[in-house]
Swiss-Prot record:
Cofactor binding, per record: Binds 1 zinc ion per subunit. The zinc ion is important for the structural integrity of the protein.
Family: Belongs to the MsrB Met sulfoxide reductase family.
Name by which UniProt lists this protein: Peptide methionine sulfoxide reductase MsrB
PROSITE patterns tied to this protein: MSRB
Length: 132
């Protein structure tokens, strides 16, 4: 997968204020406020910044957290995971594997088959519905 590396000013021009704050500055949307937290539409969730396929709706589940949650990405290269020591705790940050957009965090409290909960900001995603 070819990487995308753009200056922040370019991203600022292309994204909404909320998307820029979350994806490029590492922000977090309020729980239960995002467009996709309760969506059940079948499809693929893509990175809002670069269009890379990230998560399949087949891996989405209601974690009760208020953010879209998935038990796995579409493939291992779609996302990358980094240690995050912000806010006085240790978490694993999830970023887009292609453009390095901040997506959310992954926690070890998800359902089978992976036991993982990818807790993702709606503003970092764009759902492309499956054709019926």
């Amino acid at each position: 997968m070819s990487k995308i590396d753009k200056p922040l000013d370019s991203w600022r021009e292309e994204l909404t204020e909320e998307q820029f704050h979350i994806c490029r500055l590492g922000g977090t949307e309020r729980a239960f406020s995002g467009e996709y937290h309760a969506t059940k539409t079948p499809g693929i969730y893509h990175c809002t910044c670069c269009g890379t396929a990230l998560f399949d709706s087949d891996a989405k589940y209601d974690s009760g957290s208020g953010w879209p949650s998935y038990f796995q990405p579409v493939d291992a290269e779609a996302v990358r995971e980094l240690d995050d020591f912000s806010h006085g705790m240790h978490r694993i940050e999830v970023r887009c594997g292609r453009c390095d957009a901040h997506l959310g965090h992954v926690f070890p409290d998800g359902p089978r088959p992976t036991g993982l909960r990818y807790c993702i900001n709606s503003a970092s995603l764009k759902l492309v519905p499956r054709e019926s």
